Amino acid sequence: MSNSPVLILTGFHRSDTSACGNLLSNAGLNLGNELIKPHIANRKGYFEDMPAVQMHESWLNENNTNWQYCGESDLNLSEEHITSLKGYVAKRDAIGTAWGIKDPRLSLFLPAYQKHLGERARFLFIIR
């Protein structure tokens, strides 16, 4: 595991996390190599790495929920989920520098990221 910091950028959907992602990306922070393409609802882009979004979506689906309604029930992450998180982090660490991840869904999984990344984790919460 790398010692480089990891910036976790998250906030509620439509809270300007993409605008912050845009600023950070333009400043040189690597937010992923497979960013979701711009769309009419977000013309400059989402700055979300598709593998991370897919991973988070699968975790939600396996907990019988989605990003639109998570409810107040606990999200249970299995060893398989943690293994996929470790694999994602290892892949991103391979770039050899600090990197970031942006996904509103990530706010539901902060304890898992904090536990795995430890002191490397840096958090930027966007509230609007």
Tell me the role of every PLM-derived stretch.
Residues 102-104, 113-128:
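Conserved phosphate-donor/acceptor-positioning beta-strand/loop module used by diverse small-molecule
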Residues 54-58, 87, 91, 115:
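Charged/polar, solvent-exposed surface patches and flexible loops
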Residues 17, 107-111:
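Short, well-ordered alpha-helical microsegments
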Residues 1-83:
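PAPS-dependent sulfotransferase catalytic core
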Residues 72-74, 95-104:
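Surface-exposed cleft-lining segments at the edges of enzyme active sites
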Residues 85-86, 110:
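Generic structural signal for well-ordered alpha-helices
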Residues 5, 77, 90-97, 116-117, ...:
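Catalytic phosphate/metal-binding cores of nucleic-acid and nucleotide-processing enzymes, i.e., regions
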